[in-house]
């Protein structure tokens, strides 16, 4: 989009993810993101978590796993040729987890 020649690598994929506006929704099509270093064809993998959990212990386990992955998984992701999420996005996702409730409306805690 900026007219620069970029190579498909971790840095240009991260630049595409960093250029997305994640503030309104986590659903993003990362094609042709702005930024002089952004690779133009980048994709994201999504995990859906129900806001109302009928099995809160399982929902808590899912959040605990992703919390661990966000904290400890960047190196393993890179070794498998995946690109980790930007730190600001990880923080935004963690904040959103406060909206996950059980059937009675109580927040599902995972720590």
Stretches with model-predicted labels:
Residues 77-78:
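A short acidic/glycine-rich loop-to-helix N-cap element
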């Amino acid at each position: 989009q900026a007219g620069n020649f970029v190579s498909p690598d971790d840095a240009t994929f991260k630049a595409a993810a960093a250029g997305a506006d994640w503030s309104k929704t986590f659903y993003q099509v990362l094609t042709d993101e702005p930024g002089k270093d952004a690779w133009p064809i980048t994709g994201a993998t999504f995990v859906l978590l129900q806001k109302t959990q009928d099995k809160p212990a399982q929902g808590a386990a899912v959040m605990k796993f992703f919390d661990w992955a966000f904290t400890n998984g960047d190196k393993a992701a890179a070794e498998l040729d995946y690109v980790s999420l930007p730190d600001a996005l990880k923080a935004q996702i963690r904040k959103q987890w406060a909206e996950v409730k059980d059937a009675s409306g109580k927040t599902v805690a995972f720590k």
